[in-house]
Amino acid sequence: MAEHKPWDGRFAEKTDDMVEAFTSSIQVDKRLYAHDITGSIAHARTLAEAGVITSDEADAMEKGLRQVKGEIEAGNFKYDDSLEDIHMHIESRLTEILGPTAAKLHTGRSRNDQIALDNRLYLRDETRRIIAMLHELRQAIVDSAQAHLDYFVPGYTHLQRAQPVLLSHHLMAYYEMFTRDSDRFTDALYRINVMPLGSAALAGTTFPLDREYTASLLGFEGVTQNSMDAVSDRDFIMEFLSDASICMVHLSRMSEELVLWSSSEFAFLNMPDAFATGSSIMPQKKNPDVPELVRGKTGRVVGSLMAILTTMKSLPMAYNRDMQEDKPPLFDAVDTLKACVAMFARMVPKLEFNRRNMFDASNQGFLNATDMADYLVEKGVPFREAHGIVGRAVAYALDRGRELHEISLNDLRKFSDKLEKDLYEALTVEHVVERRRTIGGTASVNVIAAIGRAQTQLQAETSGD
């Protein structure tokens, strides 16, 4: 246990052991060690540049900090609840290595702007990793869409069969979702990548520290403009968690469809053995546990967003100890999102779609009814009138247990004399799909173009254009 704390000068009694355990955050924030050390090295360089310490002292600090980093990564570092957090642990060990020189490192700095910096460095790194992981998932989806261009599948509304679409069109809908997710994370980086160090406790520092210089050392785009806001701002965490929640909702929606499609009732998809599990009692079972878990883990990430919003909602400026509670939900959400995106990127290329079952389902249930109405419109029948005609024809077919295209022309003409033999071609699955050529529609020419645009976009992201 540490004999003295860096702030205990005005205290007559030592901290209660239970209070030390209660307020300690080291088991959570120790993952920030590398970012904390990176920030401290930059701060030492800034102190030297301002003439507050010598260059030799800054060199010694950097060498000592790198030694601490090595000890942590080698598993030789000892943690102690009495030191509260990762900042104090690193400073305490640096003091053991350097002696009095280490005491100069915290000049012009508070733990308030120090943790604000660590959070931003950490989240900048993790956001970039997530963007890269989403790139892999999006590429996997595009590749699967390319491989299944001639597969048809029912499109659904209200979980009822609606109109047939290309499976590739369905998959590319998820590409659009995950691209928006990637764009949101990219946009969030602009607000994450701002340097708060130099704000000190809340009012700035009396030392002539060049904050722009520190920002350049750490690769930040700029510096914060208000010291009170800088140490109390957690908007960037809330924004990240909002983006993460939306991304997880997209993963959850896709998971739900994979679960449904792999069921015997749908049988559109065979979940690969490597991504399924069995039952401890029912030998025949093959359970889609991976998408089920992703669906379940969505609640954790959304819960993390609610946790930080609730923590921050009533805090006066500037820093409050409540903000220590920002890290558990943030870290958990980052870990969860990364695991789920990585799992999907690995699983999507292995999905086995049942072409015949999907086509048969697309050819049943009157998915071509809208096209029969459109056919009548092209013959001069007003759409609402055509809608009623087809509705009555559907009821007639239902009573006889048949599809529209299975009803004879003579029987269909009882509903409208505008119906001709060419109607049957208009009612085929292929024709229904290929007629939808408006921008964004499911016609193969559109889907092929969408895949091409996506490949170009992904390639540009890889090359950095």
UniProtKB/Swiss-Prot annotation:
<dbReference type="InterPro" id="IPR009049">
    <property type="entry name" value="Argininosuccinate_lyase"/>
</dbReference>
<dbReference type="GO" id="GO:0042450">
    <property type="term" value="P:arginine biosynthetic process via ornithine"/>
</dbReference>
<keyword id="KW-0028">Amino-acid biosynthesis</keyword>
<comment type="pathway">
    <text>Amino-acid biosynthesis; L-arginine biosynthesis; L-arginine from L-ornithine and carbamoyl phosphate: step 3/3.</text>
</comment>
<dbReference type="InterPro" id="IPR008948">
    <property type="entry name" value="L-Aspartase-like"/>
</dbReference>
<comment type="similarity">
    <text>Belongs to the lyase 1 family. Argininosuccinate lyase subfamily.</text>
</comment>
<keyword id="KW-0963">Cytoplasm</keyword>
<dbReference type="GO" id="GO:0006526">
    <property type="term" value="P:L-arginine biosynthetic process"/>
</dbReference>
<keyword id="KW-0456">Lyase</keyword>
<dbReference type="InterPro" id="IPR020557">
    <property type="entry name" value="Fumarate_lyase_CS"/>
</dbReference>
<protein>
    <recommendedName>
        <fullName>Argininosuccinate lyase</fullName>
        <ecNumber>4.3.2.1</ecNumber>
    </recommendedName>
</protein>
<dbReference type="InterPro" id="IPR024083">
    <property type="entry name" value="Fumarase/histidase_N"/>
</dbReference>
<keyword id="KW-0055">Arginine biosynthesis</keyword>
<dbReference type="InterPro" id="IPR029419">
    <property type="entry name" value="Arg_succ_lyase_C"/>
</dbReference>
<dbReference type="Pfam" id="PF00206">
    <property type="entry name" value="Lyase_1"/>
</dbReference>
<dbReference type="InterPro" id="IPR022761">
    <property type="entry name" value="Fumarate_lyase_N"/>
</dbReference>
<dbReference type="GO" id="GO:0005829">
    <property type="term" value="C:cytosol"/>
</dbReference>
<dbReference type="Pfam" id="PF14698">
    <property type="entry name" value="ASL_C2"/>
</dbReference>
<dbReference type="GO" id="GO:0004056">
    <property type="term" value="F:argininosuccinate lyase activity"/>
</dbReference>
<dbReference type="InterPro" id="IPR000362">
    <property type="entry name" value="Fumarate_lyase_fam"/>
</dbReference>
